[in-house]
UniProtKB/Swiss-Prot annotation:
UniProt PTM: N-terminal cleavage of acetylated cysteine of immature actin by ACTMAP. Oxidation of Met-45 by Mical to form methionine sulfoxide promotes actin filament depolymerization. Methionine sulfoxide is produced stereospecifically, but it is not known whether the (S)-S-oxide or the (R)-S-oxide is produced.
Observed phenotype of the null mutant: Homozygous mutants are viable and fertile, but fail to form proper IFMs and are flightless. The IFMs of these mutants display mislocalized Smn and Actn.
Tissue: In adult thorax, expressed in the IFMs.
Keyword set, alphabetical order: Acetylation, ATP-binding, Cytoplasm, Cytoskeleton, Hydrolase, Methylation, Muscle protein, Nucleotide-binding, Oxidation
Transmembrane segments: none
Modified residues (Tele-methylhistidine): H74
Modified residues (Methionine sulfoxide): M45, M48
Function: Actins are highly conserved proteins that are involved in various types of cell motility and are ubiquitously expressed in all eukaryotic cells. Required for proper formation of indirect flight muscle (IFM) myofibrils. Multiple isoforms are involved in various cellular functions such as cytoskeleton structure, cell mobility, chromosome movement and muscle contraction.
Propeptide feature: residues: 1-2
Protein name in UniProt: Actin, indirect flight muscle
Subcellular location: Cytoplasm, Cytoskeleton
Amino acid sequence: MCDDDAGALVIDNGSGMCKAGFAGDDAPRAVFPSIVGRPRHQGVMVGMGQKDSYVGDEAQSKRGILTLKYPIEHGIITNWDDMEKIWHHTFYNELRVAPEEHPVLLTEAPLNPKANREKMTQIMFETFNSPAMYVAIQAVLSLYASGRTTGIVLDSGDGVSHTVPIYEGFALPHAILRLDLAGRDLTDYLMKILTERGYSFTTTAEREIVRDIKEKLCYVALDFEQEMATAAASTSLEKSYELPDGQVITIGNERFRCPEALFQPSFLGMESCGIHETVYNSIMKCDVDIRKDLYANSVLSGGTTMYPGIADRMQKEITALAPSTIKIKIIAPPERKYSVWIGGSILASLSTFQQMWISKQEYDESGPGIVHRKCF
């Protein structure tokens, strides 16, 4: 428990990871996979106390005998029963708090359907009996965490990427662009190109191994063609990785071919623009007077922006697209993997924010629709 009686909770529900903790802290207390697993086989051993479902790390560690499901797809909650399990797990097992005693700040994807916001609100008040809650847009929180109120955020997580221009604290919905290309797609692509090398990864459990390879060894090349030539000419870029069974695999140009798909989605057979063009297009949808401020405040956020070399490459690509006289600055805070959560922690602990909460009383009077009036 926090010192103050009703310390607010901040929960950032991502497609891949759920980040949860207490407002005012500088990092989330709990970070666990947004997974619900159900046994594939009937238990053989009597009295093992097999549960009918597992959440988070426990599901991850028993992945060999479970079927894993992600209730959040492309940043948007699609399976509410499983989502409820994840929230229950967050309150009771991870944070060990009584949800009826703490206000909760939840995060949502930009362009989240209205019905979804209402459903989130309803579950918090009716299932968990929260005293108060608020829903904030993820990218806006990332910008706050970087100490700005104006800028463009490229938020790229496991399930979806968004470019969100924000002016004086308000997201500009007409200029938000969504790109269904993110960490999970890169993991799948890495699985595919490793298969071409003769290493087979197919199951949901093996995908987690590939995700680990991706996080530890991949990087973004400043010049892709040149890097490919270097990789072909020598073994200087090769790295080895030990699989859980002790087998050692070698990975070479896959290290930068995998994240290159962010800049060239055609690698994945997608016809969309790369992340650099998406940022540029998003800026061009904004009023001409604020573009300069956006170019100078381009903030990266989310786990898929953690690749070494990504900021330099973005700088290079956007400089090539933008007018030559304009100053371009890519901000890549070291804590950007959790900057949405950190922004939420900052927001929920501001004294000026305390009147913004939707209280249980307001919810009882107005119903779930209150969320559209109070959170924007």
